Amino acid sequence: MTQSWQTIPEMVLSAADRFGDAEAVVDGPLRLSFTELVTRIRCAAGAFAEHGIQKGDRVAVWAPNSAEWIIAAFGLLTAGAVLVPVNTRFKTEEAADVIGRSGAKAVLVQQGFLGQDYAAPAGVPVIDLKSDFLSSGSPFKQDVSGLTGTDISDIIFTSGTTGRPKGARMNHRQTLRMYEEWATLADLREGDRYLMINPYFHTFGLKAGLIASFLRGATMLPVAAFDIVRVVELVEAERITMLPGPPTLYHSLLAVPDKGKLATLRAGVTGAADIPVELVRRIHDELPFQTLMTGYGLTEAGNVTLSRPGDSFEDVATTAGLPCEDIDVRIADDGEVLVRGYGVMQGYLDDPAATAEAIDGEGWLHTGDLGAFTPSGRLRIVGRKKDMFIVGGFNAYPAEIEGFLLEHPAVAQAAVIGVPDARLGQVGKAFVVVNAGKSAVTSDELIAWSRDRMAGFKVPRFVEFIDALPLNATGKVMKDRLR
């Protein structure tokens, strides 16, 4: 489909005319039509403008999925600002680093979520999403912000092997084009009822969730924290048709005793972890889904490959599908997946060295993932060059976790790998060499200590104490020996 919008606000604001009184958002007792939602977004844009937010300013949102998140994010984009979503699982220090380096002029939070009070770095105003701020502005008029398609729309931070999160910058035009194709291949339709368990701070939740729904006219139902009992209740009560999520979601749905409660489900999307062929077969046989799409993507490039309607169970389970339109994918001599095309990011924020390392002179993004093509041209991801592993859909980076562990006085050396887990796909296992002169520490104590210092998905589930890490001639840990 040829889309005429150049910017995300242009597309989002047009939803009032395109879908009118159709239901746009359901969040608890709150129900808004597209007309009502767009009105609230315009008011939020006015509030940001009156707060001094101007074109190109960055605003962080550090909060769980909610109607207010949607209104705030698209309100600040409409005012011409750049959205900086922040992972709700980050501890205060982790978030402060990202917010500080983003140069955010404000940060929006939901106080008390997951028992945490959110605070920003000194000098950055904190606005509670549940306050009356979003409704306090005069409705913002379209096009006042003067945005173009090549302006940056969002900066989503991703961790590298150095452990220091890097902000991947994307523009309006590439985002709109990319998720138009996603919506088509995922079979997202006008009037679909889309239950959103993927967090909005993640590319999937924000773009394959919110952007795609505004493109198509799907009803958005945000879920703040995953709870399978609540998910099943919502599927039945709200007649959910679209339900993407990690493989763990589908495992949970297969265990639901009364499958009749799930009868309205039509389209699913998964990925981010290895999927057994038998799981895909069971999803088709035991659940009402008519389509199940998978794919491969990354923060720095959005969608790279997606499966196609009619793909076999084996193709959906064991490959990430075919390259997206006008996206080139090739496998380097060392097996690394390289990506080139309109979807590649506009570079890392304030980090030209890291950008040059990631994107070579010919425009190829070096993903750090290892892959191969099947005879049918589908991409199969075979490993992670940078040792990243995926815990329930969240990327975990060993170098970052190792850095935290080394802060413990009893830890001399640490190496973290991903190990299989039936529920989460993978979890972390730490191999630790203790400091001889320090008091001993048990695995349970180290895990508990870690829980206080890093997001839950990063915390190692297992700790094994060893006398020495296996090192190569240059002093690098040979993690294949640990597996």
Could you tell me what each predicted segment is?
Residues 3-5, 20-21, 139-157, 164, ...:
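Conserved pre-ATP/AMP-binding loop-to-beta segment of ANL
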Residues 33-35, 153-177:
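Conserved AMP-binding A3 loop
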Residues 50-51, 78-136, 142-145, 258, ...:
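Structural core segment of the AMP-binding/adenylate-forming
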Residues 90-93, 107, 235, 243, ...:
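AMP-binding/adenylate-forming catalytic core of the ANL superfamily
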Residues 313-317, 322, 344-368, 374, ...:
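Conserved ANL (AMP-binding/adenylate-forming) active-site segment centered on the GW(Y/F)…HTG consensus within
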